[in-house]
Amino acid sequence: MASVGTLAFDEYGRPFLIIKDQDRKSRLMGLEALKSHIMAAKAVANTMRTSLGPNGLDKMMVDKDGDVTITNDGATILSMMDVDHQIAKLMVELSKSQDDEIGDGTTGVVVLAGALLEEAEQLLDRGIHPIRIADGYEQAARIAIQHLDKISDKVLVDINNPEPLIQTAKTTLGSKVINSCHRQMAEIAVNAVLTVADMERRDVDFELIKVEGKVGGRLEDTKLIKGVIVDKDFSHPQMPKKVVDAKIAILTCPFEPPKPKTKHKLDVMSVEDYKALQKYEKEKFEEMIKQIKETGANLAICQWGFDDEANHLLLQNGLPAVRWVGGPEIELIAIATGGRIVPRFSELTSEKLGFAGVVQEISFGTTKDKMLVIEKCKNSRAVTIFIRGGNKMIIEEAKRSLHDALCVIRNLIRDNRVVYGGGAAEISCALAVSQEADKCPTLEQYAMRAFADALEVIPMALSENSGMNPIQTMTEVRARQVKESNPALGIDCLHKGSNDMQYQHVIETLIGKKQQISLATQMVRMILKIDDIRKPGESEE
């Protein structure tokens, strides 16, 4: 092992260690280290703050290759931000955790963590120990989560009445670039989830929902297809563009004459030899096509390609085919059509065929772009959301927005309790934490009050982004919540003339809101317990 330093002795013979390269290392300790962390976290949170809510602004991210992404999604913004500070990287991870677990609320969790650290900075300046602040935050988070359980309402999750789910999805999509048609998008997301949901296990398999996009048309042209869309076309332009009552052979084996496993060499010495080889290949192809047709199949979908000669023979024998279909699409087609994937040609039987009511090739506008749509499948639990849009950026943002909406609906199927948005839940929790703080006889009381103040940053950011006076709006709503004992009163971001979020149908999932508070508190607690940073300094040239 490499030596880390040199052992030396003082004048009394006592040993001490001189650590190597200590002069080239930077070190921050105590309050200075904490302030450095808080400053980095605040910088990230302040960047995200303007993206919060239905009137939140989008961010344009340009990567090293010059590719542009315009997005409102917190996790996407943070993942594309080029951050160097260690704590800023932790904020990125925090947002990713929220995205992986819940799928929505990624901006809010970062803004809340930044507000908690900002409040902690003021307490540190007043001489309160970081551990006491962390403990106070922990107590306050527990109270807030218990209070959320008390003020939550249940939403009826019923396939025959999807309206409550649509209203929740609309809240999620309200802040996105697709909010011009968010009712339509919410309906598409809800129908997709309810189609594939397993209501007995209360779970949703996202593998059965495929999201495809094609540039052209308008966002309003987006539709839900009860089947699979593949970004391929029939292998020959003269093949029929539509196959009705398709019996599909799903092949992952090469569509070509078999090759010996061992190394081999074939000498073609004359024209006759070459013709004989060509004849053998043709006979073998015809034999394979005959084998497919004997099973009753009238469409072949291959993972691998086949040459032009085979393509011509398929056309001659009236067997439409699709080549170079990717692995995930092959699996989805097999699930949707109820077919079995055939890895060896010899194993193909009629029992392994998939069934679809219609397989057709569709074209787009004046371009040569074509796609294959497989509909009316045997298993109706596989769906595709097909997005249209003016450019690639809008389609990518629509995909991210729909991902958030799909996650929110899945969370409602798992746990159908909701709280009201527009900052209503945060204001109610802040009031509950403040009341409990007054009963706390220890120093943690200050931290609990600071936690309540931090919770109010979310509704203040919402009102600020909506062009209101944040302090005045916040004061009025807080006073009304206490006076009317109504935890559904929040910020009227859309200027509809009512602060009642229940009336406005601004709904958020309870599981998502709990996760926000819990993750932000854990993160802040971890940061407050760091009091020493050592990192290598700039190397001397």
From Swiss-Prot:
List UniProt keywords, sorted A-Z.
Answer: Acetylation, ATP-binding, Chaperone, Cytoplasm, Cytoskeleton, Hydrolase, Isopeptide bond, Magnesium, Metal-binding, Nucleotide-binding, Phosphoprotein, Ubl conjugation
> Cellular location of this protein?
Cytoplasm; Cytoplasm, Cytoskeleton, Microtubule organizing center, Centrosome
Q: What is its main location?
A: cytoplasm
Q: Where is it found, in Gene Ontology cellular component terms?
A: cell body; centrosome; chaperonin-containing T-complex; microtubule; myelin sheath; zona pellucida receptor complex
Q: Which GO terms describe its molecular function?
A: ATP binding; ATP hydrolysis activity; ATP-dependent protein folding chaperone; beta-tubulin binding; G-protein beta-subunit binding; mRNA 3'-UTR binding; mRNA 5'-UTR binding; unfolded protein binding
Which positions does UniProt annotate for ADP binding? G53, G105, T106, T107, S175, G422, D492, E508, K513
Binding sites annotated in the UniProt record for Mg(2+): D104
Q: Pfam families recorded for this chain?
A: Cpn60_TCP1
Q: Where does ATP bind?
A: G53, T106, T107, G422
The record places the cross-link (Glycyl lysine isopeptide (Lys-Gly) (interchain with G-Cter in SUMO2)) at K20, K210, K214, K265, K275, K279, K392
What GO biological process terms does the UniProt entry carry, in alphabetical order? binding of sperm to zona pellucida; chaperone mediated protein folding independent of cofactor; positive regulation of telomere maintenance via telomerase; protein stabilization; response to virus
Tell me how the protein is altered or processed after translation: The N-terminus is blocked. Ubiquitinated by the DCX(DCAF12) complex specifically recognizes the diglutamate (Glu-Glu) at the C-terminus, leading to its degradation.
Supply the enzyme class, top level.
hydrolase
* EC number(s) reported in the record: 3.6.1.-
Which reaction is this enzyme known to catalyze?
ATP + H2O = ADP + phosphate + H(+)
List every position bearing N-acetylalanine: A2
Q: Which residues carry this modification: Phosphoserine?
A: S26, S346, S539
The entry assigns this protein to a family as follows: Belongs to the TCP-1 chaperonin family.
**What assembly does the database describe for this protein?**
Component of the chaperonin-containing T-complex (TRiC), a hexadecamer composed of two identical back-to-back stacked rings enclosing a protein folding chamber. Each ring is made up of eight different subunits: TCP1/CCT1, CCT2, CCT3, CCT4, CCT5, CCT6A/CCT6, CCT7, CCT8. Interacts with PACRG. Interacts with DNAAF4. Interacts with DLEC1. Interacts with SPMAP2.
- What is this protein's function per UniProt? Component of the chaperonin-containing T-complex (TRiC), a molecular chaperone complex that assists the folding of actin, tubulin and other proteins upon ATP hydrolysis. The TRiC complex mediates the folding of WRAP53/TCAB1, thereby regulating telomere maintenance. As part of the TRiC complex may play a role in the assembly of BBSome, a complex involved in ciliogenesis regulating transports vesicles to the cilia.
Q: Which PANTHER family would you find in this protein's record?
A: CHAPERONIN
The name on file for this protein is T-complex protein 1 subunit epsilon
Q: What is the lineage of its organism?
A: Eukaryota, Metazoa, Chordata, Craniata, Vertebrata
